[in-house]
Amino acid sequence: MSKTNKSKSGSRSSRSRSASRSRSRSFSKSRSRSRSVSRSRKRRLSSRSRSRSYSPAHNRERNHPRVYQNRDFRGHNRGYRRPYYFRGRNRGFYPWGQYNRGGYGNYRSNWQNYRQAYSPRRGRSRSRSPKRRSPSPRSRSHSRNSDKSSSDRSRRSSSSRSSSNHSRVESSKRKSTKEKKSSSKDSRPSQAAGDNQGDEAKEQTFSGGTSQDIKGSESSKPWPDATTYGTGSASRASVSDLSPRERSPALKSPLQSVVVRRRSPRPSPVPKPSPPLSNASQMGSSMSGGAGYQSGAHQGPFDHGSGSLSPSKKSPVGKSPPATGSAYGSSQKEESAASGGAAYTKRYLEEQKTENGKDKEQKQTNTDKEKLKEKGGFSDADVKMKSDPFAPKTDTEKPFRGSQSPKRYKLRDDFEKKMADFHKEEMDEQDKDKCKGRKEPEFDDEPKFISKVIAGASKNQEEEKSGKWESLHAGKEKQRKAEELEEEPFTERSRKEERGGSKRSESGHRGFVPEKNFRVTAYKAVQEKSSSPPPRKTSESRDKLGNKGDFSSGKSSFSITREAQVNVRMDSFDEDLARPSGLLAQERKLCRDLVHSNKKEQEFRSIFQHIQSAQSQRSPSELFAQHIVTIVHHVKEHHFGSSGMTLHERFTKYLKRGNEQEAAKTKKSPEIHRRIDISPSTFRKHGLTHEELKSPREPGYKAEGKYKDDPVDLRLDIERRKKHKERDLKRGKSRESVDSRDSSHSRERSTEKTEKTHKGSKKQKKHRRARDRSRSSSSSSQSSHSYKAEEYPEEAEDREESTTGFDKSRLGTKDFVGPNERGGRARGTFQFRARGRGWGRGNYSGNNNNNSNNDFQKRSREEEWDPEYTPKSKKYYLHDDREGEGSDKWMSRGRGRGAFPRGRGRFMFRKSSTSPKWAHDKFSGEEGEIEDDESGTENREEKDSLQPSAE
């Protein structure tokens, strides 16, 4: 079916191109429509939700309901699913609809909420027949997804389908295609037969000119006037210009304009003449016969509540129907002729006649405009307004459709009738509510549909009338919102007419508001309206039109067209409305269109116009709030200059201050701890430490510090060595027993406890060693001097290389101390550090006790070196960067330390790793020094706390 329809629509679209541009325009639209036809068939066949038809039929079909479930879930079917289920753009990779209930985007269409367990289509198709599923899911999904094409499709098709959608839609589609191929009139009755249920009103309206249908007859009653007038006006002139066949469509075109505007595309038999009509005077007759016809059909069926309110309303539309048929037909002639015809199909046929008929129709359009204006301004503006509000969409769409297969026209006409009626009724309500502000949106909504039809015509018409309608660019842009850029010119024109006529249209819309009720009471209202209410409404709208004046006639015609056509349209519209899905879809689209059309119109106006229009609609509170906000901004801007600081700068400032304070604290704390941790020699050394902080930290090397401060450090450390060697040797022997170097890394981490204890002794050693090693390089070295004092007995001995009890530690330490002193210290120290501290001051006290003397001294050197060294390493690190020596020692120490400190105790973790690498990386010498001090402080604190405990 879809291929058949597609081929038909392809042929139709080619025909459409030959027959009218509207089809070619619709080739995208019509193509989506013919696809919609094919899709509706597909949906009937495969119950395809739009994305679903793309999914593999074999697995997606009920054949594998559970396989499909597997697809729902991540099963092996995932392979199938990926190609077929398109992930939603925003869904991420969630093939199973679990995260996105859409499965792969299209897996579960967003528009349908169905549990993942059963295929959205499948699960529903299981419960539903494809037909049912196709109408409502499709209208549901399509109304959501492609409001226009799919809404047109789904509503038109689904509404048509709802009554006799498949037979009618398919028959009307097929017949329309065939009828388009063959005489549409003959097949039109068959279509009417096929489409009798839903299309009966439409085809009646549609056949209104032919008086094929009851409504056609009813419409024909008003329409004879319309026909007479239409024939007299551009439509008649067009019809006169056109072949009699076209002329009869022209007669219909009044009727079509009024009632058949939608139908007439569907009575494509007449729109067939209407395409010939359109052919001869491409849109004059096609637009009057097809556009007007469509105006009637579209407005009639579509616009039961629409401007082409049924023939009866256009019995006064008698003026108006010709106005609509003629003027609108002329407008659409101009539009279609300008647009290249309602469609290329019409355009092709029409181009044969168009050059005659087009000019004629354009002339007639002008003539009709003049006539209609003479006739109360019920002319071109009126017809346009009748037609244009809808005809821009609908009427033009109708010639468009008239060119297109009647089947499509039917579907589309039904849909668009419903859509347009719904839109127009909605818009009429909203127009009445918002009157002028919203009327244009209504028109926009209608122009959206019309613009679809007219899109083809709009392009040429845009060319022709773009100059005219430039003022309608806002309307154009609404239509753009209607997604009908091509249709914009026509829509613009419609909007101009709508805008110009919008006031009249307001009255028309207000008159039309009941027709929203008609939507509810569609058949009854349509029947009544088609006979008596249409005259009443026709009188109302005619009075309104007459009151409105020439241009107002455009909108009055629009209103009347709506109202008159509302009567006719209400049947098919009621079919749609009778269907909750169609009604909801239409309402949804109408609301969306109205909202967006207003927005878009305002969006594309100049900011001042936009503001004015927006303000005009604002409540006083809104205006007041806006005023206050404006004042606040003004005052702030002019009277409260910002400091010019960015938030980043402001918070960075706070961070810097905090860092400085912390740095100061860290500097102080190591010193304080040193004093606390260290004996008088420590205080001496601490004084040295300050000096060292000043000079040695900058001096960069522990080795430098050692050598610089060695005299001092040795002096201080000698005393401490004497004191601490004994302590440290005792402690160290007990602690050295631990193979600190072997267990150093684990011990490093764990040894801070032991290190703390050991640090107590080491601090003495360190101070000695620091002095031996002259760790004047930094306060860290000083802090580590307290460690060094402990280590320094060892290190001093190492330096002294006296082979006393510390020889082992010296050897081990010295091996590393040499490098450390030489600048290789860092790594030796690292090992020592990790091992030394790690050797288990607290944690590895057992090991320390075992190997404590040699290892301890070694460890203490390393540890003392490393804690001490770590600060110095930082300092050396930083200073090495500064001094250049540090690069070697820094590389060996700082880096080694940086890597090693992690192995060390907590001290290394927080401080040494942080301070050597981090300080260097941060290139904050102060921070490095600070951290050195901190590390020294921590070491000393640990040592002090542990020293007493160790001692």
UniProtKB/Swiss-Prot annotation:
The modification Phosphotyrosine is found at residue 328. There is a cross-link at residues 202, 215, 221, 252, 333, 346, 353, 375, 384, 386, 393, 398, 418, 424, 448, 452, 459, 465, 468, 476, 481, 524, 548, 555, 599, 694, 702, 706, 708, 753, 756, 872, 875 (Glycyl lysine isopeptide (Lys-Gly) (interchain with G-Cter in SUMO2)). It is found in: Nucleus; Nucleus, Nucleoplasm; Nucleus speckle. Residues 359-951 are annotated as: Required for mRNA decay activity. Residues 1-13, 82-94, 157-166, 305-322, 548-558, 776-786, 844-854 have a biased composition (Low complexity). The modification Phosphothreonine is found at residues 324, 394, 870. InterPro entries: THRAP3_BCLAF1 (IPR029199). GO terms for biological process: circadian rhythm; mRNA processing; mRNA stabilization; nuclear-transcribed mRNA catabolic process; positive regulation of circadian rhythm; positive regulation of DNA-templated transcription; positive regulation of mRNA splicing, via spliceosome; positive regulation of transcription by RNA polymerase II. One of its GO terms (molecular function) is ATP binding. The modification Phosphoserine is found at residues 220, 233, 238, 240, 243, 248, 253, 257, 315, 320, 326, 339, 379, 403, 405, 466, 532, 557, 559, 572, 616, 619, 669, 679, 681, 695, 860, 924, 935. The modification N-acetylserine is found at residue 2. The modification Dimethylated arginine is found at residue 17. Residues 1-94, 117-558, 659-951 are annotated as: Disordered. Residues 204-220, 228-241 have a biased composition (Polar residues). ATP binds at residues 549-556. GO terms for cellular component: exon-exon junction complex; mediator complex; nuclear speck; nucleoplasm; nucleus. Residues 2-190 are annotated as: Required for mRNA splicing activation. Pfam families: THRAP3_BCLAF1. The modification N6-methyllysine is found at residue 252. Involved in pre-mRNA splicing. Remains associated with spliced mRNA after splicing which probably involves interactions with the exon junction complex (EJC). Can trigger mRNA decay which seems to be independent of nonsense-mediated decay involving premature stop codons (PTC) recognition. May be involved in nuclear mRNA decay. Involved in regulation of signal-induced alternative splicing. During splicing of PTPRC/CD45 is proposed to sequester phosphorylated SFPQ from PTPRC/CD45 pre-mRNA in resting T-cells. Associated with the large multiprotein complex TRAP (Mediator complex-like). Interacts with SFPQ; the interaction is dependent on SFPQ phosphorylation at 'Thr-687' and inhibits binding of SFPQ to an ESS1 exonic splicing silencer element-containing RNA. Interacts with NXF1. Component of the SNARP complex which consists at least of SNIP1, SNW1, THRAP3, BCLAF1 and PNN. Associated with spliced mRNP complexes. Interacts with HELZ2 and PPARG. Interacts with CLOCK and BMAL1. This is Thyroid hormone receptor-associated protein 3. The lineage of its organism: Eukaryota, Metazoa, Chordata, Craniata, Vertebrata. The gene is Thrap3.
